[in-house]
Curated annotation (Swiss-Prot):
Gene encoding the protein: MIRO1
Mutant lacking the gene: phenotype: Embryonic lethality between the apical 2-cell and the 4-terminal-cell embryo stage. Impaired in pollen germination and pollen tube growth.
Disulphide connectivity of cysteines: none
Source organism of this protein record: Arabidopsis thaliana
The protein's name: Mitochondrial Rho GTPase 1
Residues with PTM Phosphoserine: S14
Binding site for Ca(2+) 2: D332, D334, D336, N338, E343
Pfam families recorded: EF_assoc_1 (PF08355), EF_assoc_2 (PF08356), Ras (PF00071)
């Protein structure tokens, strides 16, 4: 199980090339080191800065193209060096063994400078000119570098070399390349001396994929299948027994009567890494499609399936929904239609992290009394992620075990523009933009949509927020996504021509007891309607008269009714979040969204534009009819003339 397969670098996620940038003080031997490593000889004369040097593919056993970039030490070239560092995969930082001040400059200038530039890549420290070091100053490399490496954890390794004596010059770049192909950082925490969480999650997923009979242990046959997949050679029975014995001696629960448990599997990889055999763990990860970030490589998520027009969206397919239903039942241990937070964490334990722990997903769905998710809420969360981040949704479906082709997990909907023309919609997921002035009741509306109790101390939000839930409509459940747009976020929304393309319906909430709130909501309605007319992404709209439990402004009632009639949309829907009276609002929103040709407001500018277009069309029609009459007249005249000529 510890054999290394060089072919692993050909797997998805493997770096396809390595770019190494060499930096350090003037006169520390940067250029000489590069030439000595590349040509196996010492150069008597080298230019101040070498051109980029490409090593042959066969130079190192991994067969990865390596480019070495020399840099200038002149202060005026710092910007150029900084740009090269930002493009690098690894850094070789040099000092001269015969000049102690260049060693001091590593921690005084170079390493802090790399941090300032946010160069988050492996660093190899190379002590050059080893042959020039004073024989009376034979301090060990470990003694010199240990304090620096404790302070700067980004240093992967240190090595002393001599270009003149051809001593370890090539090894400097071999180690640099190795830190790119098999970095320690993503796998192992040096402080805690333990595997990092993301590495544990990836290895757990690999274990589950290899545990074909799902009995929680890798049998001898399953271990051999794993070995052949990763290392192209089976294990001998004695080797399998040796692996089990090593694990059992250190971790008894790592082996049971059925084979190697997941705990034992993780222990083995921690052991490989502690012994410096990172290539073993990286080979396994690469074979299962992981990149250096311990995420699935982009090649495994074909970008073609995520192409769409701005007014199209993505939804889960029936195959994905059936799979998610099965996963929900599997992790809902007591089958009480309540997936508890820990059960959700267990579900995503084979993903790099739980995708729902941060905005916009955190608190976006209705919770049960125990803080969990019902199946409807669980599926709603997946629908929200599929609409907002389809690639992330598919990626997480793969992490939790979706068995089919990723392209069968989601489907692209018909264009909304075409829905309006056909006057019908086949969508199952609808997005509603919620506009309104501050303190109008938008946040309270979203909270109540999620079944949460009303509170008088509801704080206004300055950030966009999502709420998602299922709504029953004519005996069928549809998913409604409410997107709250803060008042000061409206202009930012309009910075993109396609900002309304993803909107199925817009609602405008105002405080019915505050005349200024109604006026501002009306302004927002006109702004959105104007923008929709100008960009071609017109959307159905509804006005929502909130806080109906308070005394309504008489002017607001009269004017809002007149205004909605003038614009050709439904009268405002009165609601009270405090009293829990929503007047079937969410069903009305869904109904309007499913009839995209109705409830579209017309502004005065829009009416004028349509009137103008009708006049133009009539004029063109008149011209066409007149032209047709002329053509018919000419044809009749020619027939008449021909007959007259014949009779003569």
């Amino acid at each position: 199980m510890a054999r290394y397969a060089a072919g692993a670098v050909d797997c998805p996620g493997s770096p396809k090339s390595v770019r190494i940038v060499v930096v350090g003080d003037k006169g520390t031997g940067k250029s000489s080191l590069i030439v000595a490593a590349a040509t196996d000889s010492f150069p008597p004369n080298v230019p101040p800065v070498l051109p980029d040097y490409k090593l042959p593919i066969e130079f190192f056993p991994d067969g990865i193209p390596v480019t070495i970039v020399d840099t200038s030490s002149r202060p005026e070239d710092r910007d150029i060096v900084a740009e090269e560092l930002k493009r690098a995969d690894a850094v070789v930082l040099t000092y001269a063994c015969d000049r102690p001040e260049t060693l001091e400059r590593l921690s005084e200038y170079w390493l802090p400078e790399l941090r300032r530039l946010e160069v988050k890549i492996p660093i190899i420290v190379a002590g050059c000119k080893l042959d020039f070091r004073d024989d009376n100053n034979q301090v060990s490399l470990e003694q010199v570098m240990s304090p620096i490496m404790q302070q700067f954890r980004e240093i992967e390794t240190c090595i002393e070399c001599s270009a003149l004596k051809q001593l370890q010059a090539q090894e400097v770049f071999y180690y640099a390349q190795k830190t790119v192909l098999h970095p320690t950082g993503p796998l192992f925490d040096q402080d805690s001396q333990a595997l990092k969480p993301r590495c544990v999650r990836a290895l757990k997923r690999i274990f589950i994929l290899c545990d074909h009979d799902r009995d929680g242990a890798l049998s001898e046959a399953e271990l051999n299948d794993f070995q052949v997949k990763c290392f192209h050679a089976p294990l001998q029975p004695s080797e399998i027994e040796g692996v089990k014995r090593v694990v059992q001696e250190k971790l008894p629960e790592g082996v049971n009567e059925r084979g190697l448990t997941v705990t034992g599997f993780l222990f083995l990889h921690a052991l490989f890494i502690e012994k410096g055999r990172l290539e073993t763990t990286w080979t396994v990860l690469r074979k299962f499609g992981y990149n250096n970030d311990i995420r699935l490589a982009e090649e495994l998520l074909p970008s073609a399936i995520f192409k769409r027009a701005p007014d199209q969206s993505f939804e889960l397919t029936n195959a994905a929904i059936d799979f998610l239903k099965g996963m929900y039942m599997l992790f809902d241990d007591d089958q009480d239609n309540n997936l508890r937070p820990q059960e959700i964490e267990d579900l995503f334990s084979t993903a790099p992290e739980s995708p729902w722990k941060e905005a916009p997903y955190e608190d976006a769905a209705e919770k049960t009394a125990l803080g969990g998710l019902s199946f409807d809420a669980f599926l709603s969360m997946w629908s929200l992620m599929t609409l907002l981040e389809p690639a992330r949704s598919v990626e997480n479906l793969i992490y939790i075990g979706f068995p089919g082709d990723p392209s069968t997990a989601i489907r692209v909907t018909r264009r909304r523009r075409l829905d309006r023309k056909k006057q019908q919609c086949e969508r199952k997921v609808f997005q509603c933009f919620v506009f309104g002035p501050n303190n109008a009741g938008k946040s309270a509306l979203l909270n109540c949509f999620l079944g949460r109790s009303y509170t008088d101390n509801q704080e206004s939000t300055t950030d966009e927020r999502y709420a998602v839930n299922m709504v029953d409509e004519s005996g069928a459940k549809k998913t409604l996504i409410m997107r709250e747009i803060p008042e000061d976020g409206v202009q930012g929304l309009f910075s993109s021509k396609e900002s309304l393309a993803a909107c199925d319906i817009a609602v405008f909430v105002y405080d019915s007891s505050d005349e200024s709130s109604w006026k501002r909501a009306t302004q927002l309605l006109v702004e959105v309607a104007n923008y929709g007319e100008a960009t071609g992404y017109e959307v159905p709209c509804l006005m929502v008269s909130a806080k109906d439990d308070l005394d309504s402004s008489p002017i607001s009632i009269q004017e809002s009714t007149r205004m909605t009639q003038d614009m050709g949309i439904e009268p405002p829907v009165s609601i009270s979040s405090k009293l829990g009276d929503f007047n079937n609002l969410f069903r009305k929103i869904l109904t309007a969204a499913q009839h995209p040709h109705l409830s579209i407001p017309e502004t005065e500018a829009g009416k004028s534009r349509k009137h103008y277009n009708r006049l133009i069309n009539r004029s063109l029609m008149a011209v066409s009819i007149g032209a047709a009459a002329v053509v018919v007249g000419l044809a009749a005249y020619r027939v008449y003339a021909t007959r007259k000529s014949s009779s003569a």
